[in-house]
Amino acid sequence: MEKLTILLLVAAVLMSTQALPQGGGENRLKENIKFLLKRKTAADRGMWGDCDDWLAACTTPSQCCTEVCDGFCRLWE
């Protein structure tokens, strides 16, 4: 009876150690995919960050890195 109990405990430990990496691995993979999809290239971000460089089409000044919008982002007013 003791051998059966020990065998069951060993089996339970082995199964639990196998289940942990598999369950966490799926979530980590999904998180990595979401992170990579959200990343922007330097060209998408603009030269100065998350704004549009000059000569990009705009509707509001906040879209432009220079905060100057006249249908297109401008370097100065």
Swiss-Prot record:
GO terms for molecular function: ion channel inhibitor activity; toxin activity. GO terms for cellular component: extracellular region. Keywords: Disulfide bond, Knottin, Neurotoxin, Secreted, Signal, Toxin. Residues 1-19 form the signal peptide. It is found in: Secreted. Belongs to the conotoxin O2 superfamily. The presence of a 'disulfide through disulfide knot' structurally defines this protein as a knottin. This is Conotoxin PnMEKL-04. It comes from Conus pennaceus.
